[in-house]
């Protein structure tokens, strides 16, 4: 999944960046990748399938990498590729474990209260989710914030600017919604739950990835860039990422508290099972 979707596609374009940058196709790529980022963020907010939400968040980050690549900043795309690999791998491992413990069920409306039953997995899940949002000093912050500041410095039009920032807000939106459904709301699947935290073989790998999700951003930013980027922005532009993230957080919290269920009536068939 990751090899085909993210690594092969982005890495090939990074390698062929000098050829691509000369063509007219690059502006078209910027538009398409910006719209991909935006649409993936919107779609993830309407999904109730855990794996689909994480897959759409991967697609959103793919759009982010493609768009910064199409602006000519291939080293930033590579940096984000590496940091994103750390926390997204952790996120997929946590999701796989949760789905397995939920009796192979993927619907987030049936999950809830995970932080009480599987605390270590919940810890890994939440930290990787926050790294995805670009919370300061986690892995995602160093690459994502730098990309957004470089975009703010560039001389592109407002459409690209809005696409970037709205997509960042949407990332926070669906992440908080997911965390509310999984960690805060009530457990809804069975009368007796079979959640347990004893899979230490998997937890070892998860803790290594957790450690990398915490330190890989600053570590790689020292290793990859030979000199720091000169970014000169007014205070409000600098704080723009924080503003959209806070709006996304507020919206995610409000929406997940409302009893909004999709028009899909397939969920009613679960009543026949028990």
Language model feature labels by segment:
Residues 1-274:
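Core, highly hydrophobic multi-pass alpha-helical transmembrane subunits of bioenergetic inner membranes
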């Amino acid at each position: 999944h990751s090899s085909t979707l993210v690594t092969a596609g982005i890495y090939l374009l990074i390698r062929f960046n000098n050829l691509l940058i000369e063509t007219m196709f690059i502006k078209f790529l910027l538009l398409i990748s910006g719209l991909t980022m935006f649409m993936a963020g919107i779609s993830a907010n309407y999904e109730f399938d855990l794996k689909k939400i994480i897959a759409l968040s991967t697609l959103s980050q793919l759009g982010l990498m493609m768009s910064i690549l199409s602006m000519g900043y291939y080293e930033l795309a590579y940096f984000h590729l590496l940091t994103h690999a750390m926390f997204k791998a952790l996120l997929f491992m946590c999701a796989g474990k949760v789905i397995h413990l939920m009796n192979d069920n993927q619907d987030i409306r049936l999950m809830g209260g995970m932080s009480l039953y599987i605390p270590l997995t919940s810890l890994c899940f939440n930290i990787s989710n926050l790294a995805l949002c670009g919370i300061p000093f986690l892995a995602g912050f160093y690459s994502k914030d730098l990309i957004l500041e470089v975009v703010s410095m560039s001389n592109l039009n407002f459409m690209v600017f809005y696409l970037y920032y709205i997509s960042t807000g949407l990332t926070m939106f669906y992440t908080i919604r997911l965390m509310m459904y999984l960690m805060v709301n009530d457990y809804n699947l069975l009368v007796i739950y079979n959640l347990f935290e004893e899979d230490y073989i998997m937890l070892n790998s998860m803790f290594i990835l957790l450690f990398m999700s915490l330190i890989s951003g600053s570590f790689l930013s020292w290793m990859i860039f030979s000199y720091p980027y000169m970014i000169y922005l007014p205070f409000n532009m600098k704080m723009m990422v924080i503003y959209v993230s806070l709006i996304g957080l507020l919206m995610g919290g409000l929406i997940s508290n409302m009893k909004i269920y999709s028009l899909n009536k397939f969920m009613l068939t679960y009543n026949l099972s028990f």
